[in-house]
């Protein structure tokens, strides 16, 4: 930190230190008989010198950013400068302050009328320049009169009657006041810039967007305009460039956000398509009971219900039924014993035949006997 006064120097004997001290400058232990003390830090005698002129510091020094300076170099490097003339301010001079800016008494004046501002005067600090109250009010009028557009076509105050009429008024007379403006204010013509004036302003703006007073006076003399008009044009041009830069930045951010959203959406869709695997259609499987192992070809063992025969009502299917082994101790060993393929189903239907035809054949054989 910046210290207002010189730091104190002290000389100690090396034998007085219980532990060998470390030099703040070279970061090496001090084994000399004498050492220097600056703000509770130890230095070699040869390391205690000005960081700018390399001169040895014997009586006093200035400390900033862990570096030591002599008085002359410190004032030359870090002394406060006037915001008006950019010259150094001596410690013995009186100054005027406006926010963070410091001025000489003679430099604390309006940049337009060059009237010195005293204590109690009203002023405005705009872009590092001081404006008295009167010139600031004039500037507000000129800000709307000079346009930095490419055409620079400026209409007179009489042509402002094209604006929409206020509520409750059918039309606006030419002699009436402007919308919301003071009717007592005198009308002023707007400044019209020629092609040569516009080129001169833009060429100077490309060199420096904030020219100094001498450049503004030179432009005013070359273009035949007042210094105030030149200054207002540069202010409007700077505001226009900031607005364009801000708009371009917003468009870039919007495009980047849209592109990022599309990339995220496409990546999500690709992930969903990659993770989707269609399920295979289930195979149609038919469950049937196990056939009887006996070699009987009796068609009534296939689950058909024949007509009741005399004396056969107790066991119409005979001794060997298709369900003969259901109540036995044996059981199916796996699920594969209960499933038949599609080819087995066709052969099963061929063997069974049509139940109606078999019923008619049984009836014919019954009555024939």
Swiss-Prot record:
This is LIM homeobox transcription factor 1-beta. Keywords: Activator, Developmental protein, DNA-binding, Homeobox, LIM domain, Metal-binding, Nucleus, Repeat, Transcription, Transcription regulation, Zinc. One of its GO terms (biological process) is neuron differentiation. GO terms for cellular component: nucleus. Residues 143-196 are annotated as: Disordered. Residues 23-73, 82-135 form the LIM zinc-binding domain. The keyword Transcription applies. It comes from Mesocricetus auratus.
